[in-house]
Amino acid sequence: KYKGIPTGFRLLDTVLTGLGRGDLIILAARPGMGKTSFALNIATRVAMQQKVPVAIFSLEMTKEQLTNRILSAEAGIDSQAFRTGALRAEDWEYLALATEKLHDAPIYMDDTSGITITEMKAKIRRVNQDPTRPNVGLIVIDYLQLMTTGQRSENRVQEISSITRNLKIMAKEMNVPIIALSQLSRAVEKQGNNSSHRPQLSDLRDSGSIEQDADCVLFLYRDSYYASQ
């Protein structure tokens, strides 16, 4: 039905025909818009429903925070209640089921700060050496602007350009889709930029060549986010 790996989100899969192998997909939004939650939803659906091994590189959150995010979403428990432990009796049952599902899911998490692409490749190759499971089939990176090249650079735009170019090369070399989360510049918050705050390619932070290297750029946007401000 789909050329690539289904995300589990039907409308998105209809538009993208799944996540294409070798594709670099940028998922961009302002803070608080839900890009990490959305990316984790895709990752868990791919791993749990499609049984495709997923590598999640989180440069912002720890493995424990990632795990808690996934568990609360899978169990359908409010994240605030999950954090405070204010759970109902039935929540514990849902949480136990979610924990079992996550334990069995082929998800590899890494929370190395400021990771480079070279380090990322080495870690994925080590995971792929496990003969008992298939190779990693999807890579998720949260988020692009926290990555480094491992070399001193005074020009952040050039550094991000180098990172996105090499992420695209890595996607092709490993024949897997890479979803890289990206921040948007503050310009999108200004009414003068565009009255609805809807993001555009020009709003990609440190953009450089992000739009040239990416096979697809997805923006997350919610009217309700701005209506409540």
Model regions and ranges:
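Cytosolic-facing regulatory segments adjacent to core modules
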Residues: T14, N41, R45-N135, T149
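Phosphate-binding/switch region of NTP-binding enzymes
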Residues: D13, E159-Q229
